[in-house]
Amino acid sequence: MAAQIINGFELAKEKRAQLAKEVEQLKREGIEPALAVILVGDHPASQSYVKAKQKACEEIGIRSILLTFPNDISESFLLEQIARLNKDRSIHGILVQLPLPSQINELHVIEAIAPEKDVDGFHPLNVGRMMIGQRAFLPCTPYGILYMVQSLQVDIIGKHVVVVGRSHIVGKPVGQLFLREHATVTYCHSRTNDLEAITRQADILIVAVGKPKLITSSYVKEGAIVIDVGVNRLENGKLCGDVDFDDVKQVASYITPVPKGVGPMTITMLLHNTVQAAREQHK
C-alpha cells in the first residue's frame, strides 16, 4: 500500500491562517509585527528565498522591511546595520539571508543579532536554550519538520528517529527537537558505516544531505515515516529530494514530497517566530 503524502503546502496554509488571526489581534492591541530582512549581493537563489519570505509576511499582515546591500560590503558595515535594527523597537525580527560573501564571517553576523529578534533561531544563545529545553526561538526547518510529524497524531515517545545529515541548520537541531519529545535519536553522516542498516531501523527517517535520491526503498523500514528535506535540481531542470520518492512511497506509511513538502513549513515557522517575537517584546 502506497504511503500517504504529507502535504506541507496545505499544512502551511492552515497554520498561516491561524497566524493571520494572531497578527490581527496584535494589531488591535497596537502592535504591528515587523520583520527586517537583509540581503547581501545578487545571488539568484537568495533573492528567490527572500521574495518568498516577504510575500508570506504580506499575506498574513506582517510588515517586512528589505535592506539590500552590494556583494562587496564590509563585515563592519553589516554589523552596524544589525546594531541599528537591534535598537529599533518597531522591528521585532531580524533575518540575514545566508550565504554571505567570503569577506563576511557568518558566525559574527549571527551573534550580532539580538537573541530576542533572532527569528531564524541561529543565535548560540537560542541554540543553547533549545538544547536544555528552555524557551527559545527554534530553527525554522527543524521546527517545521516536528510540526509536520506531530500533525499526523502519531506518538513520538520512544520512537526511533534516524537523522541523515548533521548540519547546524537542519540535522543537529532536528534531532534535538525529537529528543525533547522523548524519541530515541540516531545521527548518520558521510562517515557512517553501513548507512542502510541503520536507516532501516527508523520509525521516523529524516534526510537532509543534498544528494539526489540517495535513499531508496532498501533503506526504509516498512511503515516508516519519511521526511525529505533535500532540494536538488536534476539535469532536466526538475526538482527532487534526497529520497527516491516513487520508490520509497511503496514502503513508507507517510512521506513528504519535493517540492510542497518541508519547504512551505520552513517559511511558516519563520512567520510563527516573528509573531512570537512581537508578542514577547511588548509584554
Curated annotation (Swiss-Prot):
InterPro entries assigned: Aminoacid_DH-like_N_sf (IPR046346), NAD(P)-bd_dom_sf (IPR036291), THF_DH/CycHdrlase (IPR000672), THF_DH/CycHdrlase_cat_dom (IPR020630), THF_DH/CycHdrlase_CS (IPR020867), THF_DH/CycHdrlase_NAD-bd_dom (IPR020631)
Pfam families reported in the protein's UniProt record: THF_DHG_CYH, THF_DHG_CYH_C
Cytoplasm as UniProt keyword: no
Extent of the signal sequence: none
Pathway(s): One-carbon metabolism; tetrahydrofolate interconversion
Gene Ontology CC terms, in alphabetical order: cytosol
Domain of life from the UniProt record: Bacteria
EC number(s) from the headed UniProt entry: 1.5.1.5, 3.5.4.9
Matches recorded under SUPFAM superfamilies: Aminoacid dehydrogenase-like, N-terminal domain, NAD(P)-binding Rossmann-fold domains
One Gene Ontology molecular-function label: methenyltetrahydrofolate cyclohydrolase activity
Keyword match Oxidoreductase: yes
UniProt keyword list: Amino-acid biosynthesis, Histidine biosynthesis, Hydrolase, Methionine biosynthesis, Multifunctional enzyme, NADP, One-carbon metabolism, Oxidoreductase, Purine biosynthesis
Catalytic activity field: (6R)-5,10-methylene-5,6,7,8-tetrahydrofolate + NADP(+) = (6R)-5,10-methenyltetrahydrofolate + NADPH; (6R)-5,10-methenyltetrahydrofolate + H2O = (6R)-10-formyltetrahydrofolate + H(+)
PROSITE patterns recorded: THF_DHG_CYH_2 (PS00767)
UniProt binding sites for NADP(+): 165-167, 190, 231
Entry's Gene Ontology BP terms: L-histidine biosynthetic process; methionine biosynthetic process; purine nucleotide biosynthetic process; tetrahydrofolate interconversion
Family: Belongs to the tetrahydrofolate dehydrogenase/cyclohydrolase family.
Assembly and oligomerization: Homodimer.
HAMAP family, sorted: THF_DHG_CYH (MF_01576)
Reported function: Catalyzes the oxidation of 5,10-methylenetetrahydrofolate to 5,10-methenyltetrahydrofolate and then the hydrolysis of 5,10-methenyltetrahydrofolate to 10-formyltetrahydrofolate.
Record NCBIfam families: PRK10792.1, PRK14186.1
PANTHER family listed in its UniProt record: C-1-TETRAHYDROFOLATE SYNTHASE, CYTOPLASMIC, C-1-TETRAHYDROFOLATE SYNTHASE, CYTOPLASMIC-RELATED
Identification of the protein by name: Bifunctional protein FolD
Record organism: Anoxybacillus flavithermus (strain DSM 21510 / WK1)
